[in-house]
Amino acid sequence: EIRLSLVGSEMCIRDRTYTSDEKLFADYLKYGGFPQRFFLPDEHSIATYLDDLYEAIVVRDVMLRHGIREQTALRNVLAFLLDNIGNPFSARNISGRMVSEGMKISTATVLNYVDYFKEAFILLNASRYDIKGKALLSSTEKYYAVDLGLRNVIKKSEKLDSNKLYENIVYLEMRSRGYEVQVGKLDDTEIDFICYRGNEKLYIQVAYLITPADEEREFGNLERLNDNYPKYVISSDLVDLSRNGIIHRNIIDFLLNP
C-alpha cells in the first residue's frame, strides 16, 4: 500500500491492480450470480437465460401455484419492488401507485404477492430494528433481490442507483456468511445493516462513492452508536477513509477477503 500525507493528515491508498476483478464485479452487477449463466457463451445467451428463468419462476412458482389470473398486476408489483430495493416498503403506497396507473389492486393483494415472491426466493427481506428502543419495528421493512441479474431483467426503470445495488450486494454477502441481517433505526437516521451471527454483532454502512458530505453521514451515523461492536463503511473508494475506530473497506476487497 502507499501512504500519502495530505494537509497534515495521513491517508492510505491501496496499491493494487484490479483490472480483472473490476471486470468480474461489473459483470456480477449486471448479470448476477446464478451458476448456470457462467457456462453460457455470450451476453445474449445470458440475457435469454435470465428471461427464461424469470418466466419460469413467475408462471410456475407463483401464478400457477397460487392460481393468480392478474398477470400484469403481479408483474408490475414485482417490478416496482425491484426498482425500489433497499427502500422502506409500504403495501399501501404500492397499491396507490398501481391504482394511479389504472390498475386496481388492494393493499391486501400486494401483501399476498410479496409473500409469494419471498416463497419463490425472488425477494429477501430485512426487518427494521429500533436501536434505542431495542425493539423490532412491525412496519417499513426493506426488500432486496435474491440475484441482481434476475432483478435487472424484471425491473422497469433504466435508472441505475449504484448505492442501492451495492447495498443489495452487501446484504446478500452477509446472508451468505451466515449472518442475520437487520436495518437499524437510530432516532431520525439509519444504519444500513446490523448483522448478527451467534455472539457476533457488527454494523455496516454502504455507499457507492463517499463525497465529503457522504463521509459525515456514513461515518457520523456509526459514531453515534455507544457500543464497542465492529463498525464498517463499505464503498468503491480506493482511498482508506477509516476513522475513529470505524473501518473503511473497498467493496471488492470486502467480497474477496471476508
Across the structure, where does each feature detected by a protein language model lie?
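Catalytic cores of nucleic-acid endonucleases
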Residues: G184, Y208-I252
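Amphipathic alpha-helical "lid/sensor" segments that cap RecA-like P-loop NTPase cores
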Residues: D15-E55
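Single conserved hydrophobic/aromatic residue that forms the stacking wall/gate
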Residues: E1-I13
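Short amphipathic alpha-helical segments and helix-helix/interface helices
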Residues: F25, Y171, F219-E223
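Accessory nucleic acid-recognition modules appended to NTPase machines
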Residues: F38-F39, E43-K201
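Anionic group-transfer/hydrolysis microenvironments
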Residues: C12, Y129, G149, I194, ...
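Short secondary-structure boundary/capping segments
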Residues: R3, T17-T19, A26-D27, K134-A135, ...
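Conserved beta3 VAIK motif of the Hanks protein kinase fold
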Residues: I204
